[in-house]
Design a protein with these regions (language model features):
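Non-transmembrane "mature" sequence context
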Residues: 1-146
Length: 146
């Protein structure tokens, strides 16, 4: 049985989710933030778009993140970054043309979910639920579903 890297099998072979553990969150936070800002740069996101995808942290908190002063991110923030990373990865699998993969979030989209607007607008306006929906969509497309 395969298990996630942030789970631990305790006595009785029950997997325990460690993602809420502050030590685990601290260990994951700095690399997650660096990855997020690299994706934000590739996608050409504004500061407002970045903050929206991160869950609207205070401006001072956002600037601390940019400076590398991260600490242990909230579980919600780590989840948001994980979703953005998953979307980015799926797009780069779907579209071998790196420029197209990176532009996709800003292109008008005919999918009914987006109503002709870019996926980025949907994600910025829709919060974490929209991030989940876009992640499911690109993963489904990657798996061959339209």
């Amino acid at each position: 049985m395969k298990r996630a890297a942030n789970t631990k099998v305790e006595s009785g072979a029950i997997a325990v989710d460690r993602r809420h553990d502050p030590a685990v969150r601290k260990r994951m936070s700095a690399p997650a933030v660096r990855t997020f800002f690299n994706i934000a740069r590739a996608w050409g996101l504004s500061v407002a778009e970045q903050r929206a995808l991160l869950g609207w942290p205070a401006a001072s908190t956002y600037h601390k993140y940019k400076a590398g002063d991260v600490g242990a991110l909230a579980y919600d923030t780590l989840t948001r970054i994980s979703l953005v990373l998953g979307i980015y990865k799926a797009l780069h699998i779907l579209y071998p043309d790196t420029a197209l993969a990176d532009r996709w979030v800003k292109l008008p989209n005919a999918n009914a979910m987006f109503g002709g607007a870019p996926a980025l607008s949907f994600m910025v306006d829709g919060g974490i639920d929209a991030l989940h929906q876009v992640r499911r969509l690109v993963d489904a497309r990657r798996g061959g579903m339209n």
